[in-house]
């Protein structure tokens, strides 16, 4: 019996999670890294809901993020998962969640009760909701994954992205992330991958064939492009890229 799309995606995500856990200690040895946690482990109950609820609407365009931030996917297990967006747009329901061992003491894991809202995630899901009108229509057109699921933080709590780390440190994890990306594309029959930022686009270009690859500006408040004209230019760019 052939597994459903959601079951195949969950299997792929669990394989990725296991591979990332195996590569965690290598990342922790780097001088810029103090804490590494895996939302696919401690927030699996949220991520599983995301896959079960929204992967079966036939989307053929994949929006590809980079890795979690401390106030988004780190809390909700959902890419760009600002807690209000996860509750109100994605209809993610409460699950008990505990701060995992190895978490940064200044970046506690509170799950859906986290009051601070990730700006990137708020911008990201808000534009999709405004453009498509309903969550069902969003996921009839697009699906979303992060390339890497690990939250990587420095001693002060600064977010460390995969691009900040040398190849020798991050490569084993990135290879697993590449395999996962290819699996998602194959399972869903994805025809277009849109990198949210140039890093994600480059990862897609390095490992994917026979799909159209593009990019959109990243919604991070650290990006001048995302903030230009009060965010209007970013919104216009996003709408010009999505189907």
Q: Which residues make up each language-model segment?
A:
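Short hydrophobic/aromatic-enriched beta-strand-loop microsegments
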Residues: 211-218
């Amino acid at each position: 019996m052939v597994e459903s799309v959601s079951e195949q995606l969950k299997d792929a995500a669990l394989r990725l999670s296991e591979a990332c856990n195996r590569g965690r200690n290598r990342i922790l040895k780097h001088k810029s890294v103090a804490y590494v946690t895996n939302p696919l482990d401690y927030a699996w109950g949220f991520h599983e809901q995301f896959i079960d609820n929204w992967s079966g609407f036939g989307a053929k365009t994949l929006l590809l993020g980079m890795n979690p931030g401390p106030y988004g996917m780190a809390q909700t297990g959902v890419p760009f998962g600002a807690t209000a967006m996860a509750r109100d747009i994605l209809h993610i329901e409460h699950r008990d969640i505990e701060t995992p061992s190895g978490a940064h003491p200044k970046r506690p894991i509170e799950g859906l009760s986290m009051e601070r809202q990730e700006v990137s995630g708020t911008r990201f899901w808000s534009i999709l909701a405004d453009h498509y009108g309903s969550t069902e229509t969003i996921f009839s057109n697009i699906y979303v994954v992060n390339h890497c699921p690990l939250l990587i933080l420095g001693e002060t709590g600064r977010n460390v992205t995969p691009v900040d780390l040398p190849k020798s440190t991050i490569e084993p994890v990135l290879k697993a992330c590449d395999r996962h990306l290819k699996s998602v594309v194959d399972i869903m029959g994805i025809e277009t991958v849109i990198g949210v930022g140039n890093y994600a686009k480059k990862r897609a270009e390095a490992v994917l064939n026979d799909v159209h690859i593009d990019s959109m500006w990243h919604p991070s408040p650290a990006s001048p492009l995302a903030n230009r004209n009060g965010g209007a230019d970013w919104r216009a760019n996003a709408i010009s890229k999505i189907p």
